[in-house]
């Protein structure tokens, strides 16, 4: 379900940029779709495209007040797939044929291009833990970072974090592990959970709870979950809470439009102008 986001920010003047040529553009008002405030994908997106601007001592999210807000990757995809004038952004690893990813600055959104740094719009997938991990949670983390776990990461379209990982060695731990947070990290975490539970023969069960990155980090800090999931780096105030972030994968952020939209390529400046509300009509991209 989408709703209008009423941001308490001031308008910013964005410098004139050279827009990429669009041979056959869509027409009508651009329907901007964004994620909720606690989303790690949103946090990384606004930083990478310069939508977050420094004003005094604070960083301000300049996402247009006209944007509609979705609260998960799946809802974002459903919203964009059902609206010919929509534009949004999702985890590259979650991309399927219900929406179309546009090239950014001429680079296709693909795991290969993220790995070779041709596609610049990428961010880490982190697991977040407190000072003390249960034996069961430590064993699951060991599996994620093993060669076995990292192969699952790669098989599901993400960039593995550890090229020299060693094979998983099962411990004697038993119990339950609760993992909570980012909706972008959730799909690959579900795959890791499934494979891990087969390997350990049911001695350790894993429960994955989907929310957003900020909720996952907070839950890990407060001991509500064993492991938090975040699709962004920790903020300064979060690192001071004795939390440790471990990168388990790298993922691109795909800028997506409806499959019936003729636009295939946007510049970074165009994306910024769209999401800050400077560009509001699809026809303006062809000028």
For each predicted feature, which ranges?
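Positively charged n-region of N-terminal signal peptides that target proteins for export
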Residues: 1-10
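Exported/periplasmic ABC-transporter solute-binding proteins
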Residues: 10, 19-287
């Amino acid at each position: 379900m989408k709703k209008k986001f009423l941001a308490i920010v001031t308008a910013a003047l964005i410098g004139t940029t050279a827009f990429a040529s669009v041979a056959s553009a869509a027409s009508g008002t651009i329907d901007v779709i964004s994620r909720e405030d606690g989303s790690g994908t949103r946090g990384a997106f606004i930083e990478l495209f310069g939508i977050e601007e420094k004003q005094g001592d604070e960083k301000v999210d300049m996402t247009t007040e006209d944007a509609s807000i979705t609260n998960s990757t799946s809802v974002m995809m459903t919203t964009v797939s059902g609206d010919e004038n929509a534009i949004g952004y999702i985890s590259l690893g979650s991309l399927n044929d219900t929406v179309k990813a546009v090239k950014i600055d001429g680079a296709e959104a693909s795991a290969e291009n993220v790995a070779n740094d041709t596609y610049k719009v990428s961010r880490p997938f982190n697991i977040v833990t407190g000072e003390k991990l249960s034996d069961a949670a430590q064993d699951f983390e060991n599996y994620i970072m093993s060669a076995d776990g990292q192969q699952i990461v790669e098989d599901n379209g993400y960039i593995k974090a550890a090229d020299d990982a060693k094979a998983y060695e099962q411990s004697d731990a038993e119990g339950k592990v609760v993992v909570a947070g980012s909706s972008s990290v959730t799909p690959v975490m579900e795959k890791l959970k499934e494979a891990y539970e087969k390997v350990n023969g049911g001695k350790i069960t894993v429960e994955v709870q989907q929310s957003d990155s900020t909720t996952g980090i907070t839950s890990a800090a407060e001991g509500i979950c064993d492991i938090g999931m975040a699709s962004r780096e920790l903020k300064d105030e979060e690192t001071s809470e004795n939390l440790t972030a471990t990168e388990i994968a790298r993922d691109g952020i795909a800028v997506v439009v409806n499959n019936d939209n003729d636009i295939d390529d946007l510049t970074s400046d165009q994306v910024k102008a769209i999401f800050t509300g400077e560009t509001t009509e699809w026809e303006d991209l062809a000028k």
